[in-house]
A protein has these predicted regions:
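Residues at alpha-helix caps and immediate loop-helix transition turns in enzyme cores, especially N-
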Residues: 27, 58-59, 120, 186, ...
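Acidic-leg catalytic submotif of subtilisin-like serine proteases
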Residues: 1
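Histidine/acidic-residue-rich, glycine-tolerant segments that coordinate divalent metal ions
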Residues: 4-16, 22-23, 35, 41-164
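DPxDG-like acidic metal-binding loop motif
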Residues: 25-32
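Metal-dependent amide/peptide-bond hydrolase catalytic core
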Residues: 126-227
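Ordered, soluble secondary-structure elements with a strong preference for glycine-centered loop motifs
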Residues: 17-18, 118, 180-185
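Residue-level signal for short amphipathic helical patches enriched in basic/charged
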Residues: 26, 54, 178
């Protein structure tokens, strides 16, 4: 259960306020209240509370369900919190403002067995660890230091036990890029590394690379209005 001392602490076991989405909802509600009380503007404002901001693809679902047919919207202004910035400060610019997000998942199938007999096994923990270290060289050795790209391995799960060498494992991770060229290069290198490790260790390696969101690009006119 959440151990925060704030007034809005979660009362549900296993659920806490740990990401910015709760803040986004509160911020938009505050903006709606402010503008509703002070209607000193022309036109109409529609406040869009996007569900499932990230992997739920909430924006896409809202569009498919007829958001723009129900409301006449000519421009959209979105915002995202930025912890560490001074209170009241807004940061924006024309062009690319947020990175894309791609997810990768790699499945390794070797041969499990007793921990006392590694020579007759295909230990996917050792092989997967080798692959993870290779993945870390993509950003540091294949892309420009100024690219702003990030590759993070975030999960490494196997079917092994304390005295049993794993026969299968899954590696998952997240990739952020500022342009499609870097994203394509990273995807291609992950593919080559998976093929190489499979050949070297004579195991089966399958992988997927899915781009959830492309880069956020700010248009000139709306950005000028904000500034």
């Amino acid at each position: 259960k959440e151990k925060s001392i704030h007034d809005y602490v979660s009362n549900s076991v296993g659920i806490m306020h740990a990401c910015g989405h709760d803040g986004h909802m509160a911020m938009l509600m505050g903006a709606a209240q402010k503008l509703s009380l002070d209607r000193n503007f022309d036109g109409r404002i529609v406040f869009i509370f996007q569900p499932n901001e990230e992997h739920g693809l909430g924006a896409q679902a809202m569009i498919e369900e007829g958001l723009f047919e129900k409301f006449s919207i000519s421009e959209i202004y979105a915002f995202h919190n930025l912890p560490g910035s001074p209170l009241g400060e807004v940061s924006t610019r024309v062009g690319q403002i947020c990175s894309s997000e791609s997810l990768f998942e790699i499945e390794l199938n070797g041969i499990g067995g007793h921990s006392s007999m590694p020579h007759v096994c295909k230990d996917v923990i050792a092989i997967g660890s080798e692959l993870i270290m290779s993945l870390q060289t993509i950003i540091s050795r294949k892309l420009s230091p100024g690219s702003g790209a990030v590759l993070s391995v975030t999960e490494f799960i196997s079917d092994g036990q304390r005295n049993i060498l794993a026969g299968s494992a899954v590696i998952k991770g997240d990739v952020r890029t500022k342009n499609s060229a870097d994203r394509d290069l990273i995807e291609n290198l992950i593919d080559k590394m998976c093929q190489g490790i499979a050949t070297e260790h004579e195991i089966e390696v399958n992988h997927i690379f899915n781009t959830e969101f492309i880069e956020t690009i700010n248009a000139q006119v709306p950005t000028d209005i904000v500034i």
